[in-house]
Amino acid sequence: MKALTARQQQVYDLVRDHISQTGMPPTRAEIAASLGFRSPNAAEEHLKALARKGVIEIVSGASRGIRLLLEEETEDQGLPLIGRVAAGEPLLAQEHIESHYQVDPELFKPHADFLLRVNGMSMKDIGIMDGDLLAVHKTQNVHNGQVVVARIEDEVTVKRFKQQGNRVELIAENPEFEPIVVDLRQQNFTIEGLAVGVIRNSDWY
């Protein structure tokens, strides 16, 4: 599968979330309204690009004719466990996947797309410990106060999200750690997903 652009990933996430929440794909007009496109035609162009990359199928003649192909390929394998992430590489690159766990994604709300092995104690005060497996819903649509998986330049971190204009604060849940401040005008910053649950590291032994 070819890598998705940031905008294509937003469209894909929106389609998947809409199916998860309503049981049906969004219309082109709904995609355009949600993501601020000027017209449904712009949404259609992004959907065609996703189809060319093999992650969706467009069913002709239906306003909601969108099928997610990527979900069908991966759902039988279980949730991928992401370990240490190499600088500059996509989070879900094959080389980062340590294994798959047979965990029902629907145990989490919204559903989990992958597990991330936690490194460090910066979030210990809300029960996220070193070595735990964090269940993550892959999306870039997050709100202030939510716990997110974020990438700053080439570093991936788990923190509580707060944004005001072009300033983002990533706040630890441990007084020993200072907030990470990101200037969106000067630094590369990406939301990789939303934390939706945690599995104790001892639960697997």
UniProtKB/Swiss-Prot annotation:
Site (Cleavage): A87, G88
Record InterPro entries: LexA, LexA-like, LexA/Signal_pep-like_sf, LexA_DNA-bd_dom, LexA_repressor, Peptidase_S24_LexA, Peptidase_S24_S26A/B/C, WH-like_DNA-bd_sf
Biological processes per GO annotation: DNA repair; DNA replication; negative regulation of DNA-templated transcription; proteolysis; SOS response
Entry keyword annotation includes Transmembrane: no
TM ranges: none
GO molecular-function term, one example from the UniProt record: DNA binding
Enzyme class: hydrolase
Reaction catalysis annotation: Hydrolysis of Ala-|-Gly bond in repressor LexA
Pfam families: LexA_DNA_bind, Peptidase_S24
Active-site residues, Swiss-Prot/TrEMBL: S122, K159
Disulfide bonds, paired cysteine numbers: none
Organism superkingdom: Bacteria
EC number, UniProt record: 3.4.21.88
Keyword Zinc recorded: no
Keywords: Autocatalytic cleavage, DNA damage, DNA repair, DNA replication, DNA-binding, Hydrolase, Repressor, SOS response, Transcription, Transcription regulation
DNA-binding region: 28-48
Known function: Represses a number of genes involved in the response to DNA damage (SOS response), including recA and lexA. Binds to the 16 bp palindromic sequence 5'-CTGTATATATATACAG-3'. In the presence of single-stranded DNA, RecA interacts with LexA causing an autocatalytic cleavage which disrupts the DNA-binding part of LexA, leading to derepression of the SOS regulon and eventually DNA repair.
Sequence similarity: Belongs to the peptidase S24 family.
Quaternary organization: Homodimer.
Protein name in UniProt: LexA repressor
